[in-house]
UniProtKB/Swiss-Prot annotation:
Fe cation binds at residues 24, 27, 57, 60. Gene3D superfamilies: 2.20.28.10. GO terms for biological process: alkane catabolic process. Could be an electron transport intermediate in hydrogen oxidation. Residues 19-70 form the Rubredoxin-like domain. Keywords: Electron transport, Iron, Metal-binding, Transport. This is Rubredoxin in uptake hydrogenase operon. The keyword Protein transport does not apply. Disulfide bonds: none annotated. Belongs to the rubredoxin family. InterPro entries: Rubredoxin-like_dom, Rubredoxin_dom, Rubredoxin_ET, Rubredoxin_Fe_BS. Binds 1 Fe(3+) ion per subunit. Its cofactor is Fe(3+).
Amino acid sequence: MSTRFEGSYLGNAARLADDAVLECKICWHRYDPAVGDEVWQILAGTPFAALPAHWRCPQCDGDREQFMVVDD
């Protein structure tokens, strides 16, 4: 049994829409694919599912599994 939190997408990024905005449950940083990630040099238009495996929250260094889908 895994003790890792798998966000509201249950750790399966294939379940996410390409335009889904996700939020870190630790620090509330939002990853918006329309914006990308300047810290990790991720281009705008990059869906969460396409982020590199080593990508982590640019604000708190949390695992990508700590991100939850934003419903607003």
